């Protein structure tokens, strides 16, 4: 897996994220990706080779290992990072579409007063509002779901987050109940708890960011309603102006198509 590509991809979304979102991206790469690349492969590099059972029955060791570890910790963590990072693709695609439309309008002369050139459009920080707000909040919601789902999968597959010193296995073709031992169980337990804790922190950051965006929208709407309440004439004038613009637009379209309004 090319983690550099993942860093470049999510780093591009970082430009349009909130402050909490930037902290989330930092936690993802420092406490999860870097730890997974640097340390996890060393800790779990001897998984099946150093899994020992006190029997010489052919196939017993492999069957017991597959029973207790159906999926490798490293592969499951890597899959979790991919799923958690994928919703950022929604935001990246939305921003790319917005820039494409803005560039098209700029070339048609509709955005000449807003931007100097096309490079200025590319450097613009897109505000999280309108349709982008829905896309951004949806991506956060999916990240929360994926984090919680993978934490449950970890607990379900391994019967908790603690790796025992001795595993009792009585699955065929084992002749009887045999004892199996894994390498460095304490170190792997500490590492597992650390990765789960990082997942919890990321999930809490996602919840905090989602609450922040919801409160921000509520505050903005409350402020807008208060403004309309304090200046009803201005709001009425603005409403009439919008209706007049719609009538003018409809009249223009009817004149072009040749149908009466």
UniProtKB/Swiss-Prot annotation:
GO-annotated biological processes: cell-cell signaling; cellular response to glucose stimulus; ear morphogenesis; gap junction assembly; gap junction-mediated intercellular transport; inner ear development; maintenance of blood-brain barrier; negative regulation of cell population proliferation
Gene Ontology cellular component list: actin filament; apical plasma membrane; cell junction; connexin complex; gap junction
Single GO term (MF): beta-tubulin binding
Topology versus the membrane: Multi-pass membrane protein
Disulfide bond positions: none
Ligase recorded as keyword: no
Transmembrane segments: 23-45, 76-98, 132-154, 193-215
Domain of life: Eukaryota
Region forming the signal peptide: none
Cytoplasmic side, ranges: 1-22, 99-131, 216-261
Keywords associated with the record: Cell junction, Cell membrane, Deafness, Disease variant, Ectodermal dysplasia, Gap junction, Hearing, Membrane, Non-syndromic deafness, Palmoplantar keratoderma, Transmembrane, Transmembrane helix
All ranges on the Extracellular side of the membrane: 46-75, 155-192
Coiled coil: none
Impact upon substituting residue 5 to M: In DFNA3B; uncertain significance
Compartments, as annotated in UniProt: Cell membrane; Cell junction, Gap junction
PANTHER family in alphabetical order: CONNEXIN, GAP JUNCTION BETA-6 PROTEIN
Main function: One gap junction consists of a cluster of closely packed pairs of transmembrane channels, the connexons, through which materials of low MW diffuse from one cell to a neighboring cell.
Record: disease: Ectodermal dysplasia 2, Clouston type: A form of ectodermal dysplasia, a heterogeneous group of disorders due to abnormal development of two or more ectodermal structures such as hair, teeth, nails and sweat glands, with or without any additional clinical sign. Each combination of clinical features represents a different type of ectodermal dysplasia. ECTD2 is an autosomal dominant condition characterized by atrichosis, nail hypoplasia and deformities, hyperpigmentation of the skin, normal teeth, normal sweat and sebaceous gland function. Palmoplantar hyperkeratosis is a frequent feature.
Subunit organization: A connexon is composed of a hexamer of connexins. Interacts with CNST.
Family under the similarity heading: Belongs to the connexin family. Beta-type (group I) subfamily.
Protein name (Swiss-Prot/TrEMBL): Gap junction beta-6 protein
Lineage: Eukaryota, Metazoa, Chordata, Craniata, Vertebrata
Gene: GJB6
